Amino acid sequence: MFRYHSILLLAILYFFEYGLAYKILVFSPATSKSHLISNGRIADELAKAGHNVTLLEIDFLGIVDSTKSAKLVKKTIVRVPKKMQGFKNVIQSFSEGVMEDEGLFELLKGNIAYQTVYNDLCEEFLENEVMFNKLKDENFDAFFAEQLNICGFGYAKALGIQRKFLISSCPFFSHVYDYTSHPAPYASVPFISDMSPEPTYLERTNNLLRGITINTFFYFSHNRLTSIFRKKFGDDFPAITEIVRNVDIIFLATDEIIDFSSPTLPNLVHVGGLGVDDDTTEMGPVFEAEMKKGDKGVIYFSLGTIANTSTIDKKVMESFLEIVKKFPDYHFLIRADKNDKNTKDKATEISNVFVSDWLPQPAILHHPRLRTFITHAGYNGLMEAALAGVPLITIPFMFDQNLNSRAIEKKGWGIRRDKKQFLTEPNAIEEAIREMLTNPSYTKQAHRVRDLMRNKPMGARDRFIKTTEWVIQNGGVHELLTEGRDLSIIKYYNLDIIVPCFFVAFYFIIFPFFKLFGGFYYYSCFGHIESKYKKD
């Protein structure tokens, strides 16, 4: 009898643990290792909550097998060999031009190249009918995908998945605002171009023009993506932007404490830092020994993967190594590409530096002897540093990095420097390090940011899981979708009212005023001359 009751109790517990579990598909194209890791964290968090998660990784770059993206969820891998090299070439071109200032033409050219080959990869992926049918048979309850390209949402629609969640893997960019028909705050947030803390007229103009240009490009890119799906699934397949416009929730992988404060949406939820603490592992004896060096502490330096130290101008790293020599009381940990022989050779001549192609970043950031992190301001590293309370010296190169660095500067827990200063003004970077090491305000503010993030009423994990389950349980929450998403630009901004009113005002008020004023001015200035001629 006791055995019977025990089995019954276990069965009941199993039901409550797994009986309400949902089947969820996480769509994760391999656009970079950092994006694979971010999506892996999402999959793991859903799995921890008891859900049945499929992590679908499409190998755009040949990096899926070597990237430990998820710890709990088994990966389903799809190869796209035909177009892979084209995508690799685009990423390589970004790395080669990373030190150049990006004008509007270069910005547009880069986006066209990236989205064009991404759409090609999407089309190749759709040819895999075996995988499509296998996934369709799963009858997933929900779907997650990033914003870099919205191919995944067309795929989810074709699979018949009802509940869709958009992951904005970096700050909310202008074209993502455009998906939702929510006006982007170009006057205050440097989406596409750099803007100083108090933006000038020209800076705001440049940001606006770039934003309009990029949004116009995405309009045509999305039309092509729609045509790809209609070619595969029929002419009645909905426009890809219509699918995205009606996603249930937008999860923003940033934190409102460190991001630019700007207008938001009812269905937008911040989940910055999701899964970050789980990656804080032991660093091992080799790195632990390095962290003990330096009389006054350790400084960590990493420029990410796009600013590849083996392809950028070698003078960049040589310049930084010269700066390292000026801080003998501090030990520097430098991440350099595995093929960067020049940096490694030069570093052997310097006693207070350790160079490696891999460093346990989360563990380093949480180490008590770390004084500052010199970074390119990629969002993964930024979130890790924020949760560890580490002040930053940011040197942005491209993509969202400039936006991130300006937000850090504005919130007071970091110093920003320009990438060109490695070559033209290295003393500016040296001065930033000295300022960071001697001014405690940056560390104090970094600790405040950490505490605010960690002590929020609801953390990222609870927000993410509870919101996801709430939406699925209720068959979507259409009540949160903004009414403006279905309006045209003309209606949304009331241009059909404003423009006619302007012409009416011009005709009945402004035009008569100028006519009267002009006649008076003409008579007062030239009337006496005409009178004189008439008398003569």
UniProtKB/Swiss-Prot annotation:
Pfam families, A to Z: UDPGT (PF00201)
Enzyme kind, highest EC tier: transferase
UniProt membrane topology term: Single-pass membrane protein
Keyword Transmembrane helix: yes
Annotated localization: Membrane
Transmembrane segments annotated in the record for this chain: 497-517
Catalytic activity, reaction form: glucuronate acceptor + UDP-alpha-D-glucuronate = acceptor beta-D-glucuronoside + UDP + H(+)
Keywords: Glycoprotein, Glycosyltransferase, Membrane, Signal, Transferase, Transmembrane, Transmembrane helix
SUPFAM superfamilies assigned to the protein according to its UniProt record, in alphabetical order: UDP-Glycosyltransferase/glycogen phosphorylase
Family named by the database record: Belongs to the UDP-glycosyltransferase family.
Protein name: Putative UDP-glucuronosyltransferase ugt-47
Native species: Caenorhabditis elegans
